[in-house]
Amino acid sequence: MSKKTDVLIVGTGCSGLYCALKLPGSLNIHMITKSCVEESDSYLAQGGICMFKDESDYHAFFKDTLRAGHYENNPLSVELMIRSSRAVLDDLLSYGTDFARDEEGDLKYTTEGAHSTNRI
């Protein structure tokens, strides 16, 4: 079987989907996954996105992320993910993505996985 494509994205989790979203709509994009979409970490994560709220949380966020990745993460990638999380969230909000909110309409945060505070 052969398919012609402009872009092949390996991975159908949040990062792969966000990559596809940011590419020009005129491109023929294909995405592949190693198993099935419903077994990816992103699918099982209940829709949560780790959010960097302020500088006072940076070191704990960094440590929690390393722990969540069983210390196999690239520290530079972790820093980039943390520092860019607000911009990515703002971008997703501009597309109209619906996130959980509290009674005042602010984003609602919870704790999941190895995180030590509500930032998801």
Segments the model singles out, each with a brief description of its role:
Residues 1-4, 112:
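A short, basic/flexible loop-to-alpha-helix module at the beginning of a structural domain
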Residues 1-2, 22-24, 37-44:
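Solvent-exposed alpha-helices and their adjacent loops that cap or buttress functional pockets
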